[in-house]
Amino acid sequence: MIRKLPCLLTGLIMTVFAQQPAPQPNGNFTGKITRLTETPPGTIAYIKFDAGSRTRWHIHEKGQLILVEEGVALEQRKGGPIVELHAGEAIWCPPGVAHWHGAAPDQGGTQYNVTRGGITWLDYVTDEEFHGKPVRK
C-alpha cells in the first residue's frame, strides 16, 4: 500500500510505503499503540495511539515533526505546558529537547512522526505529568 502525506515537507512530497500494521511492545510507550509504517534512513512513522497512550520522555538528535491526522494528540517539552493538537495540526520539537507525545486521556488518534538521527529514550511519563491541564496550540 502507498500512502501519500497530505502536506509538503521541506519542499518535497514524501511517499510512505506501508507495512502490515503490528502492535508494538510497550518498552518505550505506555498503553496500546500500533506502528502502521516506518521508512529509513529517516523515519516517517504512522502511529495509532489509543486513548491514554503516550511515549516515554525522549530526545531526538535532529528534532521531530508531529502531524496529527485524526483525533487529539498531546505533546510536552520538559518544563513546558502540555500542548493539545487536533487533526490537521502539527508541532516541531527542536533537536536535543526532551519531550513526550501521545493521545489524550479520553480520545485516541493517529500521528505521522517525522524524524532523522538517533533517539535517546528517558523515563516514563508519570500519570501526574500526563494528566496535567493541556493548552491549545
Regions found by a protein language model. Name each.
Residues 36, 55-60, 77, 83-84, ...:
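Short histidine-centered beta-strand/loop micro-motifs
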